[in-house]
Amino acid sequence: MQLSLKFVAGLVLASSAAFAAEDNVEINLQRRNSFFSTGNQLNVNAFTTHQSQVNNKYKDALENFKRNMGRDHPLLRLLLGDKRNNGGSGTVKLTDVQQEQLWAGDVSFGGQTFGIDFDTGSSDTLVNPKAYDPKKSKNSKNTHDYFRAAYGDGTTAKGFIYTDDFEIAGLKAKNVAIGHSVSEFIQDQEPSQGIAGLAFPSIQSFPKKYTPFFEALKKQKAVNSGVFQFTLKPGKGSTLVLGKVDSSKYKGKVTYVDVDPSQGFWLTDAKINGQKIKAIIDSGSTIITGPTDQVRSMVKGLKGMTPFSSGGTLMYTYDCKNTPNVSINIGGTDFKLSKSQLFFGHANNGQCVFPVAGQDGLPMEAWIVGDTFFQAVSIIFDTDKNRMGFATQA
């Protein structure tokens, strides 16, 4: 399945940014494949691989935080090497097809254009070896700084950091850092050939002297302001706005909450069905994932939930005729998830899969709030005022 996702960029019109394109530049993005086969049956292998990737991403992020900040992250839950498997309480067979799902769009380094996933849960820009050839760019520079980042089931991105000219939606910046992996860490996942991080620098694996790509755009005044806004939809009309807030994407008021950039993540206090949680807002994760014990506690309040486990992930199914009630409260505002947002495909017994999961070995005391929630709200990420804004989609 392909889905058009457009970038709308708020551009600087001053002469100092003469290279900037006109306002309302748009790029078509694709929703990278799907976790579902015909009949909306969930692909268990693709999904558990994705969950493993998320787990490894956060383990790396906490290690990066300690190296960059000289202390453990306040959310640290487990020893990073601990891969305990507490299991689930049953098994439901799921159909295995070969598809996956993330949001991807085009960027350009050194005049070379390739697809990349936009991830508010990480900070570095990493690409596969064939996506970018530094030798083809007249302004590329090998810094000889080495990087290494775990990505999935034993898959690792590793290589050297280059700096080069960067462009996205007509917005340009010079000397932006890109990790050119010598090994393929994203396999068979066109159109994406890399990851572009939108979290804060304190969790980046690159040395501190390199800033994430959006910070580079901001420092070089390629954007009017340090804000970006995700509005993701299951059909057409999904957007990522850079450099401004587009009020046409939401209705009603925007609820703002403060964010501490020193912690690296887009992190806020929240409640899910009244249960207090720490929530990391992560565009690079598909569902809502929490520590297994906390997820079990939340699900106890729902009727008709059948647990199953796969690959260290505890999930649930429910009768499709009786969708559970789930709402997430942020900043005192309840955002109720709709029937379609709570549908994550079918198990082969005909029941619906619930898009809230417990993850064994999750290295921190926080929930990862992904695409399931993104499709209910328009989210404003404000690096100028260190805050996030949430509003119901228009």
Task: List the model feature ranges, each with a label.
Residues 239-276, 344, 350:
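Flexible, small-/acidic-enriched active-site or ligand-binding loops
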Residues 381-394:
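C-terminal helix/juxtamembrane-tail motif
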Residues 275-278, 314-316, 377:
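Generic recognition of flexible, low-complexity loop/linker segments
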Residues 1-26:
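Fungal secretory targeting signals
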